[in-house]
Amino acid sequence: MRDEIRQQPAALERTLRQEIKNVEKLKKRLEKNPPRMIVLAARGTSDNAALFGRYLLEIATGIPVSLAAPSIFTLYGASLRCQDALFVAISQSGESTDTNLVLERAKEQGALTIGITNEAESSLAKLAEHAFLVRAGREKSVAATKTYTGQMLMAYLLAYALGAKIKLDDLK
């Protein structure tokens, strides 16, 4: 675990350097059609990163942010009106069944969808309209370190794409 903690700065730099073009592309799309609300879906450690993202996004953008309750979709089969909403699924592996289902249902209901994952070939990366990779490499420790801080960095980049006054140079 100590090695993975020490690898975080390089993983964050790699994520920032390789994902910035994708973030700029999303920023242009959002400038034309900004969301009225944001919904974050995640489980486990990723859910903790989503909670951080909620505070950051609401404070930095003024857009209301909610944390998804996947059982609304998985257990109760409810359909939500998702037009003009941005749904963001966060998953280290990209294979969290209920997180992916939330994104799939939101997409069916007209939401713009984003996936944040460490796995380029994951179901989440393929399902989301915009997939952002936390380029942390393989995480051997049970306690997610590199992927967790990478997900937090992606929350900053999402805030930037939504028009927050964040200077990318400050993230380097």
What is the meaning of each model-derived region?
Residues M1-R36:
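An N-terminal, well-structured beta->alpha segment
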Residues N22, E31-D170:
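Glycine-rich phosphate-binding loops that contact phosphosugars or nucleotide phosphates
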